[in-house]
């Protein structure tokens, strides 16, 4: 065990969820940074300890552009182990922002992992579910947002 994982285990055992968003520009949680930096060991500890596998960034609470941990993981080809872990732990591979994780995936391993898990592009999701994006309406009307802005 490295010192960081020991600290995370300690915090998880005391109820930490690592779901506090950075109040600055990024709106990310520690888990988003771990996903982007290929730190699958800390992510696994946090998620198995009860953290949300589909935790979103929080740039704007009414924005449909909030991304999950999987979006962070697939942005780098080297993070395929994090991508695999998140899929194994139940991440939604078809979360749409209006782009999907598959649209954003870098590297053949990430793309293969997503496709094998049933991921679709945003165009495929739009066609299958007849999704209509009106971001202006999503920002104004919360009931519209709940019905049409999230899959």
Describe the residue ranges of each PLM region.
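Ankyrin-repeat boundary/"N-cap" motif
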Residues: 1, 20-32, 56-72, 95-104, ...
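Ankyrin-repeat intra-repeat helix-capping/turn positions
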Residues: 3, 38, 77-78, 109
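Ankyrin repeat domain, specifically the short helix-to-loop turn at the C-terminus of the second helix
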Residues: 9-18, 44-53, 84-92, 115-121
């Amino acid at each position: 065990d490295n010192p960081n994982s020991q600290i995370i285990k300690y915090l998880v055992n005391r109820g930490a969820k690592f779901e506090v968003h950075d109040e600055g520009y990024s709106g990310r949680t520690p888990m988003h940074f771990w996903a982007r930096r290929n730190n699958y060991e800390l992510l696994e500890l946090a998620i198995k300890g009860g953290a949300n596998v589909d935790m979103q960034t929080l740039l704007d609470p009414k924005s449909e552009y909030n991304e999950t941990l999987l979006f962070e993981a697939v942005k780098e080809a080297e993070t395929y182990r994090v991508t695999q872990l998140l899929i194994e732990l139940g991440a939604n591979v078809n979360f749409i922002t209006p782009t999907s994780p598959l649209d954003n995936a870098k590297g053949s391993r990430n793309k293969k992992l997503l496709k094998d898990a049933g991921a679709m592009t945003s165009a495929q999701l739009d066609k299958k579910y007849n999704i209509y994006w009106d971001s202006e309406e999503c920002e104004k009307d919360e009931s519209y947002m709940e019905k049409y802005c999230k899959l």
